[in-house]
Amino acid sequence: MNYSIDIASNTKNVNYGASRLQLKRFDVSKMVDHATIAMIAKRGSGKSWVCRNIMYEKKDIATCTVVSPTEKLNSFYGNFIPPAYIYNRYDSDILSRIYSRQERMFEDNKKREEKGKKPKDDRILLIMDDCMSSKGKWLKDDQILELFFNGRHHHVSFILTMQFSL
């Protein structure tokens, strides 16, 4: 495998045998609001670090909730996310509370706009990092399906990281 980098176009050409793949640098600052992102990569490949980079670029989002079974072992998110917003395992109640919050924010903002006031920022970022150990619990959960299909309408940005595909 060999590669070449074109600095002017921000692309990297990767040759693998007879195949050629052109990769373009992803600019996180241009990512749309309320995105749904799934990262699938092997252990130790930097998925959590990519999440951290996205969090940094989206630091203007006031609320972030993290579900990470490994957090109790490595405190990766604990250095910059308050403990009240970090969960060690998935529970559908987490999403219920997020949806309730978003509904309250929506109603409050509607009232604020009627009064001519500026709406509050209702965006939220949810990260489910390496939650494959509890996939039986969340994979068929209606709350997760709602998030995948309608998260953007709830103003929820969602990042799911996994070591292998479902």
Where are the predicted features?
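A domain-level signal for caspase-like cysteine endopeptidase catalytic cores
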Residues: 65, 76-77
